[in-house]
């Protein structure tokens, strides 16, 4: 699933090419890709002839403000892509929604797994009411509101593993498997350590590392594991510099120990047994 750096990369790419241009037409090829309105034709009619004024990101959600005050919201989920095409091309097998712009340009929503969703929300609609998951998101981790005190308070009574806690969007908005593994490695924390056992010093270090890793991910254009690419069709490059994620069986870049992988709450976790000793997770 695209995480904060990937979604931010998409947002920045869309701002470069779609702003102030009227949407001349919309085509919905898979009805269930449209969450609201319930009828795809209504989705089409509300967006036709509108222009995008601004793109924002909230966690893993993309939000476009249109020139009439309405909103287009998109969640890429597991495999969604938003691709910008400057010349007409027939839709590929997994194309779900197409937005057409002047000069024959097209914004295309491609989604192999079909979990991605699009919403059109009228100007008087509260976004968090229409999409309840947005109401529970933590502050943006690269904003001033995401403080050490906030993170400490959320972890203080959390009995889950620290890896599982970091994936909770009410604790770190936009965090996913890749950057959680990277953050725990740089913090020296074993993924199975109970979140509530972290010391104030560990929480402070983890907070700083989360911000660092997410910024580095954005600077690298995100991570391409299977399907992610920017609107311009460019792959993300963070994977080539990853400390542990996706590197099972390879040598740790710090100490040379073999990177291991375990299953935790149904998710894979990559870690270095030497740099993230299991002893730090025992007896706490």
Swiss-Prot record:
SMART domains: Fapy_DNA_glyco (SM00898), H2TH (SM01232). Its cofactor is Zn(2+). Keywords: DNA damage, DNA repair, DNA-binding, Glycosidase, Hydrolase, Lyase, Metal-binding, Multifunctional enzyme, Zinc, Zinc-finger. The keyword Lyase applies. GO terms for molecular function: 8-oxo-7,8-dihydroguanine DNA N-glycosylase activity; class I DNA-(apurinic or apyrimidinic site) endonuclease activity; damaged DNA binding; zinc ion binding. Binds 1 zinc ion per subunit. The active site is at 2 (schiff-base intermediate with dna), 3 (proton donor), 60 (proton donor), 267 (proton donor). It holds the Pfam family Fapy_DNA_glyco. It catalyses: Hydrolysis of DNA containing ring-opened 7-methylguanine residues, releasing 2,6-diamino-4-hydroxy-5-(N-methyl)formamidopyrimidine; 2'-deoxyribonucleotide-(2'-deoxyribose 5'-phosphate)-2'-deoxyribonucleotide-DNA = a 3'-end 2'-deoxyribonucleotide-(2,3-dehydro-2,3-deoxyribose 5'-phosphate)-DNA + a 5'-end 5'-phospho-2'-deoxyribonucleoside-DNA + H(+). DNA binds at residues 94, 113. Involved in base excision repair of DNA damaged by oxidation or by mutagenic agents. Acts as a DNA glycosylase that recognizes and removes damaged bases. Has a preference for oxidized purines, such as 7,8-dihydro-8-oxoguanine (8-oxoG). Has AP (apurinic/apyrimidinic) lyase activity and introduces nicks in the DNA strand. Cleaves the DNA backbone by beta-delta elimination to generate a single-strand break at the site of the removed base with both 3'- and 5'-phosphates. Belongs to the FPG family. This is Formamidopyrimidine-DNA glycosylase. The gene is mutM.
